[in-house]
């Protein structure tokens, strides 16, 4: 995590060679989210990747099964990954995913938990492949995707289990905007810098009202 300024932070995912999500990343993400929640100056945080071709991919199936399941629930009472995603969505800070490369499974779920998503038109690939592998997504995309793109398109993404390009993600509403790859970093940095120049209370209160009207409740993210 780097601080561009007191109000503008970046969380850069750097787990070579493929940025595969696994139990070892949960404490690191939790530490980042806790810092974002508790710092009284940060206003905007950008999530990006240091690994070419990969934003964040799903999942390290070679990790011991007991590793993630042995972790206690987080402050929300939800399982650790879902707890982190819910807290990110509700944090009094603007979160932006800058997607270049593959954002699959958990990578997509992290992007969906952010307030805004911007993608490389040429290099971003978003996907929920889980149904094709015989598993059910666990990070709440069934509640988030239909709110962004409608029920039919949400089901297409989840049940089609196929890659979605940056350009198609923009058409679907999966991301706010897909930009030419050479413009992505400059655009996101300019937006984050602009937001960070505004009053923190105005930012957090505006976001809170939008959250009340738009975020899924916990029981939709983790149905029994």
Outline where the language-model segments fall.
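Conserved CoA-thioester-binding segment of acyl-CoA-metabolizing enzymes
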Residues: 1-48, 52, 86
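Glycine- (often His-adjacent) and acidic-residue-rich active-site loop
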Residues: 49-87, 103, 134
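Well-ordered beta-strand positions
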Residues: 110, 116, 156, 160-162, ...
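C-terminal long alpha-helix characteristic of the crotonase
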Residues: 119-124, 175-223
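CoA-thioester-processing core
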Residues: 84, 98, 104-158, 187, ...
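Hydrophobic/aromatic residues within transmembrane alpha-helices
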Residues: 47, 60, 110-112, 169, ...
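Structural motif
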Residues: 91, 98-99
